[in-house]
Amino acid sequence: MSRFVNLEFGGESEDQSWNQKGRLKDEAFYFAEARAAFENGSFESGLRLYSKVLEFNPQNAAAWTGQVRMLIELGEFREARLWADKALERFPHEPELLAAKAVALGRHGDLQGALAFSDASIEERGDTPYVWLARADVLLAREEPRADYCFEKALLLAPGDWFIIWLGARVRHYYEQFVLALKLLQRAVELNAGHFRLWLELGQCQQALGLVGPARNSFTQARQLNPRCQEAATALGHLSGTGLWRRVRGSWLRLFGQ
C-alpha cells in the first residue's frame, strides 16, 4: 500500500513555479509531463506526475484515471482497483475510469466484475480507443475470442496513432500473445522509429519467440536511441551470455560426440 502515501496530491500543495525554460509549472505542464512519462514507459514517474496534476485541480478526471492506469502498468492491480473506487466516488460516470477499473478487476481475477465495469464504460458513451482496449483486456482475461474485434475497434478510432498501437501491443504481450504483440509493435515502429521504448518492447517480443538475432538488433536500436535505457543493456547482456553458452555447448558436443 506504499504507493497510496500522498498519491492523490503528491504531498503538500506548492505555489506555481517556473521551470528552467521559463514555462509555468501548472496543471497543464504536469499533465503533459505525465503523458510523456507514460509514453516512455516510466510508469512510476507517471504516477507521481498525475498526482502533481491533482494538486492543481482535484477535479481532473483524466489525472485520476491516469493514476489508475499507471498502477495497472506497474502490476499493482489491487491498488489500482482501490484507487479506482476512490476516484469513482467523484466521477461515477467517467467511461475511461470505469474501463480502467475493469482492467484492474480482470487482471486481479474478478472476471465477472471486470465484464460488468467494462459494460458500464461502454454504456456511458465511452467510444474511445482506451475503452475498447480495456474491453479487449477483459475479454482476454476471460479467454473470449471477441477480443480481436475490440482491438480492431480501438485502432480504427485512432488511425495511425503509434501510442494506441503500442498500448494494444502491451495488452497482447501481457497475455503472452507474442506474435500478435510483435505485429503491432512493428506497425508502431513504422510510425515512430525514433522511440526507444518501441524498439525495447519489440526486442522483448522477439526474444520471447526465440528470435535472438532480431532481438539483439532491436535492443541495440533502443540503446542507441536512449543510452540510459538499462532494460536494453540488461537484455543485450543476457543475449550475449546465451550466445556464449550455446557456443561452449556446441564445442563440447563436437568434442565428446554427445
What are these regions (language model features)?
Residues 8-11, 40-48, 74-86, 108-120, ...:
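Structural signature of tandem alpha-helical TPR/SEL1-like repeats
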Residues 103, 130-141, 152-190:
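Alpha-helical adaptor scaffolds
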Residues 23-56, 62, 66-73, 103, ...:
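Alpha-helical segment of the N-proximal tetratricopeptide repeat
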Residues 27, 61-62, 95-96, 127-130, ...:
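Helix-start (N-cap) detector for alpha-helical repeat units in TPR-like alpha-solenoids
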Residues 137-141, 204-207, 230-246:
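TPR/TPR-like alpha-solenoid helical repeat scaffolds
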Residues 8-29:
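TPR-adjacent "capping" and linker segments in tetratricopeptide-repeat scaffold/adaptor proteins
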